[in-house]
């Protein structure tokens, strides 16, 4: 599974997932399913944010082509993928600036158009079950919840899906592709079932980490959201990481 993750996901996402697990004292070589789940969740968060901006008139727009003359504000602030200290610094800054209620738990994104924090969920189970678990944990109507599944289903607070249909379809397609790639290598069952995961771990240890099946073809194109996040992760100065509200649209 670890080898699959390294082949399937952008190296920057893999690095962020490794740092997140290390921060919580988790071993990616043992908890390989969790490693894969974190990478998947990170990618969905970045895809959620990609290409969505607010123009100078305050309108939400989608920009996929480079326009050097456009001064655009990112519609979504990415909180997921940062270390906890930096994440809370960003959340506090947002609350102080917008007057938003501070969440009890770290959310994944902040939507400047709708003025709300967003919790993104990616589940291998029934979407409504996972949605209820998230809602019971958060216990706040202020945080918007949006759940995606590997089967193409989704569920959101008050059926408000935030994004346009095409953007959501891009996320669903990526999740379905990940599922198919896992299944083709005999990894999907262990990813879904804890019992199967133990069996797979034994196989992985026996094979000394060798990946079954052929290498996964993966695009190395860096997500625009990752380009913004990378310098923030590396910079240890909290004040330097809070970027200016308006930025030029990043190159694709």
Swiss-Prot record:
Determine if Signal is one of this entry's keywords: no
MF annotations from Gene Ontology: RNA binding
Site described as Important for efficient shutoff activity and nuclear localization, located at: 195, 198-199
InterPro entries the record matches: PA/PA-X, PA/PA-X_sf
| Alphabetically ordered keywords of this record | Decay of host mRNAs by virus, Eukaryotic host gene expression shutoff by virus, Host cytoplasm, Host gene expression shutoff by virus, Host mRNA suppression by virus, Host nucleus, Host-virus interaction
Offer one example of a GO biological process linked to this entry: viral translational frameshifting
Site positions (Important for efficient shutoff activity): 202-203, 206
Q: Which family does the record claim for this protein? A: Belongs to the influenza viruses PA-X family.
Notes on the domains: The probable endonuclease active site in the N-terminus and the basic amino acid cluster in the C-terminus are important for the shutoff activity. The C-terminus acts as a nuclear localization signal. The C-terminus is recruited to host protein complexes involved in nuclear Pol II RNA processing.
What is the protein's given name?
A: Protein PA-X
- Species of origin: Influenza A virus (strain A/Leningrad/134/17/1957 H2N2)
């Amino acid at each position: 599974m670890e080898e699959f993750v390294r082949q399937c996901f952008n190296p920057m996402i893999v690095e962020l997932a490794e740092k997140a697990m290390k921060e919580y004292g988790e071993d990616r070589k043992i908890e390989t399913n969790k490693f894969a789940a974190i990478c998947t969740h990170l990618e969905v968060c970045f895809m959620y944010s990609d290409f969505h901006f607010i123009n100078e008139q305050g309108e939400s727009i989608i920009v996929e082509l480079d326009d050097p003359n456009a001064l655009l504000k990112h519609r979504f602030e990415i909180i997921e993928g940062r270390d906890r200290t930096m994440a809370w610094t960003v959340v506090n800054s947002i609350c102080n600036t917008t007057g938003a209620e501070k969440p009890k738990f770290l959310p994944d994104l902040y939507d400047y158009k709708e003025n709300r924090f967003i919790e993104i969920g990616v589940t291998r189970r029934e979407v409504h079950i996972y949605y209820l678990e998230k809602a019971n944990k958060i216990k706040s109507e202020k945080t918007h919840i949006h759940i995606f599944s590997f089967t193409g289903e989704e569920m959101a607070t008050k059926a408000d899906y935030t994004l346009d249909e095409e953007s959501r379809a891009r996320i669903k397609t990526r999740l379905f592709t990940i599922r198919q790639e896992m299944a083709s290598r005999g990894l999907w069952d262990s990813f879904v079932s804890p019992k199967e995961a133990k069996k797979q771990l034994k196989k992985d240890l026996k094979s000394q980490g060798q990946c079954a099946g052929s290498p996964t073809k993966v695009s190395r194109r860096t997500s625009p959201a990752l380009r913004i996040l990378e310098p923030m992760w590396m910079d240890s100065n909290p004040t330097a990481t809070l970027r200016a509200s308006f930025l030029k649209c990043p190159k694709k």
